[in-house]
Amino acid sequence: MSFEQLFADVFGFPQELVKDELGFREVPRWDSLAHMMLIARIEDTYEMQFTGDEIADMKSVGDLRKSLRAHGVTV
């Protein structure tokens, strides 16, 4: 499953609109609970783990991708 598919699946958001500049304010369902659901799905899918600071700093799709790349994940 691609990162875009994963994001779209968690938020019920059109996959083609998943762009780096997309932030939590533009996705109505991106609240704190959904954010943690997304993090759990990402960690399970890519077999890695974010730090608490990384999770707190994720405010956009671009932030998510940057953190994934820092963990060696190609997205």
Language model feature labels by segment:
Residues 1, 33-36:
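Short alpha-helical elements of helix-turn-helix
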Residues 1, 58-62:
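An alpha-helix initiation/capping motif
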Residues 1-16, 69-75:
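Thiotemplate assembly-line natural product biosynthesis machinery
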Residues 10-29, 46-59:
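Phosphopantetheine carrier-protein modules
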Residues 63-67:
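Short, cationic-aromatic polyanion-contact patches
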